[in-house]
Amino acid sequence: MSKFAKICVVVLCGITSVFCTSCENMFSVDYRIVGSWQVSHTYLNDVEIDSTIYLGYAPQTYYNIYADHVMSVMARYGGEYRESSFAFWVADQKNKTVNFQYTFYGKVYDFTADILKLNRNEFTIEFTDEKGDRWRLQMFSRSRH
């Protein structure tokens, strides 16, 4: 192998390792979860529902998730959209879960959900609440069209 070919191989290996390292973050939950998501389908114990007293889980609710682990939840209440307060999220890449904590209209929401699907257009989570009811929220991206 010529000296030029060896240099080319070394350079290509270096570029590939740098590229793979920087792309690794693109596949992490922390990277992919960031965006604006709209709840399109809500399931309670495997039955799709159109409304619920838990505004944070209702269809047409927005989860605006930011990279610094802050978020906002916006839901319809009294014909207007209202926004949550004290909203945070933390993802666990290894266990494929996400914890959401926020206060919305006097109710504190604090739950850890299994991530069933997360890609650039769809985000589906499932969790069991303190009463033992199983919720599944299917959300679609509002920020990546």
Over which residues does each language-model region extend?
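Bacterial N-terminal signal peptides that target proteins for export
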Residues: 1-9
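Repetitive helical segments and hydrophobic/amphipathic motifs
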Residues: 12-15
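C-terminal motif of bacterial Sec signal peptides marking the signal peptidase cleavage site
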Residues: 18-22
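Lipid interaction determinants
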Residues: 24-85, 93-145
